[in-house]
């Protein structure tokens, strides 16, 4: 085994610049985990490779086939389901050097980018053209477009604008045999053959290696404003969500924080949040400047009629950023409570939101676990963030039991286990709770057809 690995590394150095091949124990350890930090993952990658162009990616694929070695693609490693973890060793294929925005076309309203482009950089670049790329995961300051495509990530604005899958119109993909596949076209509509874009978006690097993508853009909204409404019960908060939608007002976001999340954020990252409230909604409105007062009035009236106990509104960019920074700081705040923190991404139809939130709280209380809940409740998504100590074996066992029950509850409420994080290795043992066996069999057949040697991120999803 060691001899094979040494030969692989030697061949990689011949194909790539030696400075782009990392092989020391310390270097490999740094890339063995992603943001999930799964306790069970013990194996290190055999080698870490930084690629700079398509030809180098093809060379790595050729060698992976030769040595029957897994390839695990990595952008910033921010995913939280173990999709970048190295359970079986292999090659970490790092795309941080393929980070060029190749083209922004104002007329077509598209951008062509390499996989390593950081989402926040892309958003800032297109906004200078008066354009807008809506998907906005909380880690957009560091996460990459390649990772977003792999996990089909969304964010707060997915309620109004959709997720990554709604904006990818074309990709260049290096297949497991080294061929380059073009999945779509440079047009906004395409009904010419199968839609291969939707096959690769969310495939977690198991079907092919996305090296370049063409992204659909939309006009940048003229104005935006955020409201933070507090409630004395989860029930009234969830009820307000449905009332807003029923009134045909479509905010850019309707996000949620429960009392634990509010208090934890305020403790570690003070933001003038009201810590005595049971829940809060973060509602962003956008559009033409002339429509903002009307939208705000309608929503405030609905919130007041829904028993909102307090409403904070942004009147300038500083206040806007304060509210959103507080919401996005929840995970970081939870991380200060214990050595480890886990998050999740369960989603149910909105009619079952209250049952999901209260059910998760009951499960965590049953197993004596703290939980902070945030989420994009406009589309039914909840992120339970559980701070734990992996070195406490008893607590970790309780955590695993609680997770299984949370997934059972989600399935019972007609939900799914991931709306935007993916499955990875963390949820694969539970996927059959929400995906039927026939669908899973077809997924496995697709995987085998695209990757007969099982070298592309093996043992992820199922």
Where are the regions a protein language model picked out?
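C-terminal substrate-recognition/cap domain of FAD-linked oxidoreductases
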Residues: 22-32, 218-219, 228-233, 238-402, ...
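FAD-binding subdomain of flavoenzyme oxidoreductases
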Residues: 100-255, 456
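N-terminal flexible segment immediately upstream of the FAD-binding catalytic core
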Residues: 1-62, 78-109, 261-270, 317-343, ...
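Activity-critical C-terminal alpha-helical subdomain
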Residues: 179, 428-462
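Alpha-helix capping/hinge segments and adjacent helical runs
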Residues: 17-18, 411-423, 452-456
């Amino acid at each position: 085994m060691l001899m094979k690995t040494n030969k692989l590394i030697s061949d990689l150095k011949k194909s790539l610049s030696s400075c782009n091949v990392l092989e020391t124990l310390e270097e490999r350890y740094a890339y063995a985990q992603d943001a999930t930090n799964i306790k069970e993952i013990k194996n290190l990658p055999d080698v870490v490779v930084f690629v700079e162009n398509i030809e180098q990616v093809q060379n790595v694929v050729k060698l992976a086939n030769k040595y029957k070695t897994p390839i695990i693609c990595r952008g910033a490693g921010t995913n939280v389901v173990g999709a970048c973890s190295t359970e079986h060793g292999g090659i970490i294929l790092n795309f941080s050097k393929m980070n060029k925005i190749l083209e922004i076309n104002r007329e077509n309203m598209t951008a062509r980018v390499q996989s390593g482009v950081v989402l926040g950089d892309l958003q800032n670049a297109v906004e200078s053209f008066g354009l807008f790329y809506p998907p906005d995961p909380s880690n957009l300051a560091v996460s990459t477009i390649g990772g977003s495509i792999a996990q089909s990530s969304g964010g707060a604005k997915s309620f109004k604008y959709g997720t990554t899958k709604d904006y990818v119109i074309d990709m260049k993909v290096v297949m497991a045999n080294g061929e380059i596949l073009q999945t779509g076209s440079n047009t906004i509509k395409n009904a010419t053959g199968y839609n291969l874009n939707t096959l690769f978006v969310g495939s977690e690097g198991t079907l092919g290696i996305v090296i370049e993508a063409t992204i659909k853009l939309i006009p940048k909204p003229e104005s935006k404003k955020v409201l933070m409404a507090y409630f004395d019960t989860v029930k009234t908060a969830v009820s307000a969500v449905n009332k807003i939608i029923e009134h045909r007002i479509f905010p850019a976001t309707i996000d949620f924080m429960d009392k634990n999340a509010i208090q934890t954020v305020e403790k570690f990252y003070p933001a003038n949040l009201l810590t005595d409230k049971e829940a809060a909604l973060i509602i962003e409105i956008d559009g033409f400047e002339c429509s903002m007062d009307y939208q705000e009035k309608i929503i405030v009236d609905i919130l007041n009629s829904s028993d909102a106990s307090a409403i904070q509104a942004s009147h300038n960019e500083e206040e806007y950023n304060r509210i959103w920074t507080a919401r996005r700081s929840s995970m970081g705040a939870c991380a200060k409570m214990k050595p480890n923190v886990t998050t999740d991404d369960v989603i149910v139809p909105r009619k079952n939101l209250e049952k999901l939130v209260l059910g998760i709280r009951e499960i965590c209380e049953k197993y004596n676990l703290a939980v902070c809940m945030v989420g994009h409740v406009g589309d039914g998504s909840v992120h339970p963030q559980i701070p734990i100590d992996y070195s406490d074996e008893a607590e970790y066992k309780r955590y695993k039991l609680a997770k299984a029950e949370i997934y059972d509850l989600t399935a019972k409420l007609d939900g799914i286990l991931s709306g935007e994080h993916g499955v990875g290795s963390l949820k694969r043992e539970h996927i059959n709770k929400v995906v039927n066996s026939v669908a899973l069999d077809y997924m496995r057949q697709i995987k085998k057809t695209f990757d007969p040697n099982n070298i592309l991120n093996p043992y992820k999803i199922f």
